[in-house]
A protein has these predicted regions:
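Alpha-helical assembly-interface signal, strongest on the long, hydrophobic N-terminal helix that forms
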Residues: 1-76
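Long, compositionally biased low-complexity segments
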Residues: 56, 63-486
Length: 486
């Protein structure tokens, strides 16, 4: 057998060695890069899975996503999120939370952003276009309301003094033979209605017959808007695109569609559905306040207190407009003046005719406003600005409003504004942080009926994680991952 002698040059040996080194280097780089990619894939899959564990009732009832940090156990620890990441096979990756956002952070900004995104996608901007031209008028009503409250207080105090004088005059002549002359029976007194409102509250005269005011209440100290909240950290992108006015209008429409208010079953939105028939307002939230929007506006501890406050604000607005209508109606002004002459004669104060006339006009406007509120609470509409032909209460009917039990009712004008329209205006006039945090109060109270441990400041909406993995020998690879509900 012939032997073959082989040989290789030094150059070829070196070249072959370099080639092998290059090949193995490529393979090592591929292993490292593959490990990086696999780690990212594992982490992405895990974080998507974690954020898929959103609170179901929160999403279904309020269209807002959030992870219950305690997973309904009451153990609110950020480590729970890390454990869930590992559960979803994030491998040997080491996770460290660098940023976390809760629903209540920055006065509920995260909650509000999700609501706006939902409303914009679900309904679009056409929903609020018709209101953009009225916001300036709404802002003017704040001044009118304040001025009218001051004027009404002054007038009511004056009416009380007149009533005291009339009572004193009546007691002096009682049982005595007096010459025939002007008299004013108690049931004819036009000032009693305003006196009752001041002493017993507006609810005593406006609740429709057969209707009962809710007695539900909450402990304010435990609400998200009052208690010390868990705060997130880190920097996250914020939602942009809409101007402040449009955002307020859009958010308020969400509130009107989602939350309850006084006697909503009588209103034009009684079914709690949107245009497509999808149910929105959940009327069966048994543990929630019945008048949620009134709470969002006033922030008091009971339905009765909140309704009283909202209705009195509404009463002041109506009395302002009704007084203006009366002042222009010469026929009714003459009626008021004639009654003022009678009262001044009884008081032996002829110089008091003009002040008495103004008090009678205010009381008359107050009586008409009581009728307006009865209509509104009955689900009907009233003219935004009254005209003489739309006036309902006569001067002689004022005392009847005290004893009729709500049976004296005005007619539905078929046009004008309803109770929900006034709620919309009042919501627009409140500050954004205050409205948002009280919304979260209502969300918590409603969800407590099924999940007593639910807390809005323990609901995660955005998360930033720094991840670390050993990809090869002692080589570490670090990368950030961000995820959030937008």
């Amino acid at each position: 057998m012939r032997s073959v002698k082989g040989e290789i040059t030094v150059f070829l040996s070196l070249s072959f060695t370099l080639l092998l080194s290059f090949i193995f280097g490529i393979l090592e780089s591929a292993v490292i890069q593959g490990s990086k990619n696999l780690s990212r894939i594992d982490t992405d899959r895990a974080i998507y899975s974690v954020f898929g564990e959103y609170h179901q009732e929160l999403m279904e009832q309020y269209h807002v996503f959030g992870i219950d940090l305690g997973y309904r156990t009451g153990n609110y620890e950020e480590e729970n999120l890390i454990q869930r990441l590992h559960y979803y096979n994030s491998g040997s990756t080491d996770h460290q939370i660098k940023g976390i956002q809760y629903l209540t952070d920055q006065s509920g900004q995260a909650f509000r952003e999700q609501v706006l995104a939902y409303m914009e996608q679900r309904y679009g901007m056409d929903l609020v276009k018709k209101f953009t031209g009225t916001t300036e008028k709404w802002e003017q009503t704040e001044t009118e309301e304040s001025d009218m409250e001051k004027k009404t207080d002054e007038m009511t105090d004056a009416m009380e003094r007149v009533n005291d004088s009339l009572d004193a005059s009546g007691s002096q002549t009682e049982g005595e033979d007096v010459e025939e002359g002007p008299s004013l029976l108690d049931e004819e007194n036009p000032f009693r209605i305003m006196q009752k409102i001041k002493k017993e509250g507006i609810l005593s005269v406006v609740i429709p017959k057969g209707k009962k005011v809710s007695e539900k209440s909450v402990d304010l100290s435990g609400q998200a808007s009052k208690r010390t909240l868990k705060k997130g950290y880190g920097t996250f992108p914020t939602r942009k695109g809409l101007d402040q006015t449009t955002e307020k209008l859009l958010y308020n429409e969400y509130l009107l569609k989602t939350f309850g208010y006084a006697f909503r079953q009588n209103s034009e939105q009684s079914e709690g559905t949107d245009e497509s028939g999808e149910k929105e307002w959940q009327s069966d939230r048994s543990d929630a306040l019945a008048y949620e929007l009134e709470y969002i506006l006033q922030g008091k501890g009971s339905d009765k207190e909140n309704l009283e406050s909202v209705l009195f604000r509404l009463f002041l607005l109506r009395i302002s407009g009704n007084y203006g209508c009366l002042a222009k109606d010469m026929g009714r002004v003459a009626e008021a003046e004639a009654l003022a002459v009678t009262i001044s004669a009884l008081l032996l104060m002829p110089e008091a005719v003009e002040p008495l006339k103004q008090m009678i006009l205010v009381a008359w406007a107050g009586g008409e406003s009581v009728m307006d509120l009865r209509c509104l609470l009955d689900g009907r509409k009233v003219p935004l600005v009254k005209s003489a032909d739309k006036w309902v209460v006569s001067l002689s009917q004022l005392p009847l409003l005290l004893t009729d039990g709500g049976s004296v009712r005005g007619n539905d004008s078929g046009e004008g504004v309803g109770y929900s329209d006034y709620i919309r205006m009042f919501l627009f006039l409140k500050s954004v942080p205050e409205i948002t945090m009280r919304t979260l109060d209502c969300v918590e109270v409603a969800l407590h009926s099924k999940h007593i441990l639910f807390q809005a400041d323990q609901c995660v909406t955005k998360l930033e994680i720094q991840n670390k993995i050993i990809v090869y020998k002692n080589l570490n690879y670090q990368y950030p991952v961000y995820f959030g509900y937008e």
